[in-house]
Amino acid sequence: MTKYIGYVGTYTKGGSEGIYSFELDTEKKALSEPKLAAKLGNPTYVATNKNNTILYSIEKADGQGGVAAYQIDKNSGELTFLNHQLIDGPSPCHVSVDDQNQFVLTANYHSGKVHVFPVQEDGSLQSPVSEAAHTGKGPHERQEKPHTHYAGFTPEHNYVVAVDLGIDKLYTYKLKDGVLTESGSHSFAPGAGPRHIAFHPKEKYAYVMTELSNEVIALEYNPTAGEFREIQVVSAIPDDFTDNSQGSAIHVTQDGRFVYVANRGHDSIAVFEVNQYSGELAFVERVSTEGNWPRDFVFDPTEGFLVASNEETGNLVLFERDKETGRLTLLPSTVSVPYPVCVKFLHQV
């Protein structure tokens, strides 16, 4: 029997109390009922370090926002609070940690900033040592100011990448001794509203999910210069769909053959096959997430399964994934959790 532990970040309203844990049984092809793993205010995004020993979560508390650190029991999935670092103002929306477990990054949608938190030997966090603040605005009504939605590391860890929905830009930074220094930027079409980026694991490609235009943008990435070049833009929703829909999560499979994205409003997962020579995407299929407003999804460590989290209907939905074709098959395993907005597995097979 093979079971994998996962975590769900939530908005703490409507009965939600914080971070929940669950298990995927790959033999039974079923999810366990989620249980509360940590009481925390608005843990809307979580990340685990490479060794699966520490979980970092966004936190909102009493007019402050920041990051909380937890020690992970890899056998039970239980979380033990280590510490947190809070800053006055709204909470961030995205958190990531480098492979060496030296720095945690947060992106703040409300302030348009990226913060850098040094990690101590036990995995706990020091107060932030630097920040990067964006400026500008875009043409869409939601682009009245910068809205940084993602901050993470490039695959070779040469750069930090920040994606800003409010100003249609991607920034690259050098990070040395905890200090961010801007290296360059890449602009997207006005009003696109870029949200998240995912890198190809083998080739020099990256893929950006836009929230406002609900598109996937394929980029060529130069890891030496930290520069990007646009090679393709594809819609993630059908051309004849006219209702409101917003792009959310994007992930590339470990073999680099497929890109998956979630569409909130159309309420679907779209699958694209990657041309390994050009980086361009070819549409494969869209499947319903069997719920409303899929904020996130995740592959299990074998990538034979996909779990989607529907925020408005409060459910996790399980799919089996065909590794050859990329296609998804809905499984009869759906579990409830209030306002799920982020889902992650411990990523070690």
From Swiss-Prot:
Segments crossing the lipid bilayer: none
Entry's Gene Ontology BP terms: glucose metabolic process; pentose-phosphate shunt
Leading EC class: hydrolase
Keywords tagged on the record: Carbohydrate metabolism, Glucose metabolism, Hydrolase
Keyword Transcription regulation recorded: no
Reactions listed under catalytic activity: 6-phospho-D-glucono-1,5-lactone + H2O = 6-phospho-D-gluconate + H(+)
Pathway: Carbohydrate degradation; pentose phosphate pathway; D-ribulose 5-phosphate from D-glucose 6-phosphate (oxidative stage): step 2/3
Transcription regulation as UniProt keyword: no
One Gene Ontology cellular component: cytosol
Top-level division of the source organism's lineage: Bacteria
Family statement drawn from the similarity comment of this UniProt entry: Belongs to the cycloisomerase 2 family.
Function: Catalyzes the hydrolysis of 6-phosphogluconolactone to 6-phosphogluconate.
The protein, known as: 6-phosphogluconolactonase
Organism: Bacillus subtilis (strain 168)
Gene transcribed to yield this protein: pgl
